[in-house]
Each structure stands twice: as structure tokens, then as C-alpha cells.
């Protein structure tokens, strides 16, 4: 066994089950009642409880956040050849469903918030309007739990009468001006992947105050099966429903969401207190309107003395997980031929954040001793 393997692993953001065993209780109930297949009482309850928590009229539990984005695009009418404006600085799961629908993504650069720049979004609308074209939808992301500048973005979408989809996969519990992100646009998306602030092992949720859109999404997610005795399908459907077992995990996790948010914020504040004095190191930006869940605590460097890769390698040598900021979509080989809109004459804001940024371990099971170890390793690079 190597020295590194002997050291306790400190994770970026791993699943964290409740100490009370809420998840296990819901799963055991599902086994006891033989509700093992997709759909069931846990699914119904999880949808209702999540909708109540975030403050929307309707929600549908799905197999992933990616599935939720796909059905959101379908629900607003995105189809073959349509244009969709999409935040550039994000994970590929935000953009890929655009291609599932045969649509064309146009990537929008970020600003100081790390999220979609409203001025760049406006520039994109003006460019395509001059060509006689208009996007069918806009997808904004609340990156790492940081709220986008929603008022400005929504105003532009209303001006051009284009639906707004919020990718809130990383921002459950983040508040924009006191209200949950993911509930401002026409549709919102949450993710319960294993590394998210709460998990269902794998899963997602599509939410909206438009109950008809959620009803339609539920229909598509269940293979578009018609409500008749025999199997009849008038539309193309998908196998996107969440299992009753996974929903049971989600119900248990929802009961400790506030605890998880509090710990994520504690981790962010710890790093801020113990690292902010280092020359050329800044914490990710939090705006006055924002109350983020701090899903991942990120930093950005403005020094030639230490590179993000130096920190990643130094932490990994101590068996501590960290990772780079998401690689922007316009730099991805698959999307290299897609249009990219930026206000910069050279380079882009998203590329700069990618080059200089870093996600620090933000696992809610971390102890103060773990946090002290992380900060000690990082501080050591400054000498």
C-alpha cells in the first residue's frame, strides 16, 4: 500500500446520508410494500415535498437532471433546427439535450458573476434578430450554487418573448433575492446526482408553475403511453421516470437539506477566513442579491506564483480531491463549430475563469481537521 493510499481520502463532494436514517426508513418501507419498480408512493411524495420546498405548483421526478433539461426544451417547443441560447460556462449536461432535440446551441459568455452575462445575451439577440432569427429558448445556469443575474436576464427574455429555462442542478437551496433559484423561469431543473447537495443516487426534478407543461413532461417521461387499457403511443416517449427506491432516498435527503446547506456555507467561510490573505487568491464571487448554497467552494488565482494545477497536484499528493472549473462549451471539441457570443475582443470571461479557477473539496462530512489540512497544503505553496 502506498503512502497516499494510507491517508484518509477527503472528497470533493460525496453522498452524505442522514444520521437519523431517514433514507433507509423510506427504502425499507418500499421493500416491505413491494414498491420496487419506477413510480410509487415515494415518487409522488418526493414530487410534492420538493415542490412545496421550492415554492412551485408542480414537479416531476426524473432519472437525471439531464433528462429534466431535455423535457424542458421539448415542453417549450424546441425542435429540429431551432436555436437555443445556452450559458457557455457549465457542464456538458446543460448543452447536450439541445442536440437531443436536433436544435443548435449558441453559447453565451459569462460576466463577473461567473454566470450568463445579460449584456452578452442582449448582443446575441440583436445579432440573430439582424439575421431574421430568434432563439426558441434560453438556458441559464446557477453555477456552483451562485445565482445568475436573473432580473436582467428575465427582462431580456420577456422583451423578445422567449422562454427561460433555469439549470439549477447545482443550486438547490440557493436564493435569488430571497426566492429559490429554479423557480423564476418557465421551467426549472434540479439534479440529485451523487455529488449534489442532496442525492437520490441518480435523479433529477423538473419544476414549474405551469402545471400543463409538467403534465406533458410526465407523459413523455413514461414512454408517452396513452391512458388506455392496451399499449398505445401517439408520441415519441422516453424512459425517464425516477424509481420509487431512489425517490425514497430523496425524501430522506430533503429532510436534512438545511443541515447540508449550513455545512456547505461553513466550509466556504472557513476557506475564506484561512485563505483570503494569500496574494492573488480570491474566493468565488457572491453578489448582493445572492444567498448561495455554496455547493462547491471555488477560488480563482491572479498570480504567476501558483497555478490551479499546482494546487490540484499538491492536494492529490495528500489524498485530497479537487478539480478544475468546468471547461467552457465553446472549447469542447464536440461544440467547436457552434457560435459563441462574447463582449471580449480577445479570449472570453468563461475561458479566463476556467484557466484560473479551481474547485476545493466541499464535502459535508469534512471535519475542522480536514479543512485545516486542506488549507495547510494550499498555504504551503505560497511558502
Predicted region positions:
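PLP-dependent aminotransferase class I/II
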Residues: 2-3, 41-48, 56-59, 119, ...
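Conserved PLP-anchoring active-site segment centered on the Schiff-base-forming lysine
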Residues: 70-124
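Hydrophobic/aromatic ligand-binding patch that stacks against planar heteroaromatic rings
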Residues: 96-98, 156, 197, 245
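Helix C-cap/helix->beta junction micro-motif
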Residues: 101, 159-160, 318
Amino acid at each position: 500500500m502506498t503512502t497516499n493510499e494510507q491517508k484518509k481520502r477527503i472528497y470533493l463532494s460525496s453522498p452524505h446520508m442522514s444520521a437519523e436514517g431517514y433514507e433507509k426508513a423510506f427504502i425499507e418501507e418500499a421493500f416491505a410494500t413491494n414498491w420496487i419498480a419506477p413510480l410509487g408512493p415515494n415518487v409522488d411524495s418526493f414530487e410534492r415535498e420538493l415542490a412545496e420546498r421550492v415554492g412551485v405548483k408542480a414537479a416531476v421526478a426524473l432519472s437525471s437532471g439531464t433528462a429534466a433539461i431535455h423535457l424542458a426544451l421539448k415542453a417549450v417547443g424546441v425542435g429540429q433546427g431551432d436555436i437555443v441560447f445556452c450559458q457557455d460556462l457549465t457542464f456538458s449536461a446543460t448543452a447536450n439535450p439541445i442536440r437531443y432535440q436536433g436544435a443548435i446551441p449558441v453559447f453565451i459568455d459569462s460576466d463577473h458573476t461567473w454566470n450568463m452575462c445579460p449584456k452578452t445575451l442582449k448582443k446575441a439577440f440583436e445579432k440573430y434578430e439582424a439575421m431574421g432569427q430568434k432563439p426558441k429558448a434560453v438556458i441559464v445556469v446557477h453555477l456552483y450554487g451562485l445565482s445568475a443575474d436573473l432580473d436582467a436576464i428575465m427582462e431580456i427574455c420577456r422583451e423578445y418573448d422567449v422562454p427561460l429555462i433555469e439549470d439549477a442542478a447545482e443550486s438547490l437551496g440557493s436564493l435569488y433575492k430571497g426566492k429559490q433559484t429554479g423557480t423564476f423561469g418557465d421551467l426549472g431543473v434540479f439534479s440529485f446526482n451523487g455529488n449534489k447537495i442532496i442525492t437520490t443516487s441518480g435523479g433529477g426534478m423538473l419544476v414549474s408553475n405551469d402545471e400543463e407543461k409538467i403534465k406533458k413532461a410526465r407523459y413523455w417521461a413514461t414512454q408517452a403511453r396513452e391512458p388506455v387499457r392496451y399499449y398505445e403511443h401517439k408520441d415519441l416517449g422516453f424512459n425517464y421516470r425516477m424509481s420509487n427506491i431512489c425517490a425514497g432516498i430523496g425524501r430522506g435527503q430533503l429532510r436534512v437539506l438545511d443541515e447540508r446547506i449550513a455545512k456547505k456555507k461553513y466550509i466556504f467561510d472557513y476557506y475564506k477566513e484561512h485563505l483570503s490573505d494569500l496574494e492573488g487568491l480570491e474566493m468565488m464571487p457572491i453578489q448582493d442579491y445572492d444567498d448561495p448554497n455554496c455547493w462547491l467552494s471555488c477560488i480563482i488565482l491572479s498570480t504567476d506564483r501558483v497555478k490551479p494545477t499546482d494546487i490540484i497536484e499538491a492536494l492529490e499528493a495528500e489524498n485530497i480531491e479537487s478539480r478544475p472549473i468546468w471547461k467552457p462549451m465553446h472549447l469542447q471539441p464536440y461544440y467547436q463549430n457552434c457560435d459563441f457570443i462574447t463582449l471580449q475582443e480577445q479570449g472570453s470571461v468563461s475561458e479566463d475563469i476556467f484557466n484560473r479557477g479551481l474547485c476545493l473539496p466541499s464535502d459535508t462530512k469534512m471535519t475542522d481537521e480536514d479543512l485545516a489540512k486542506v488549507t495547510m497544503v494550499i498555504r504551503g505553496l505560497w511558502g
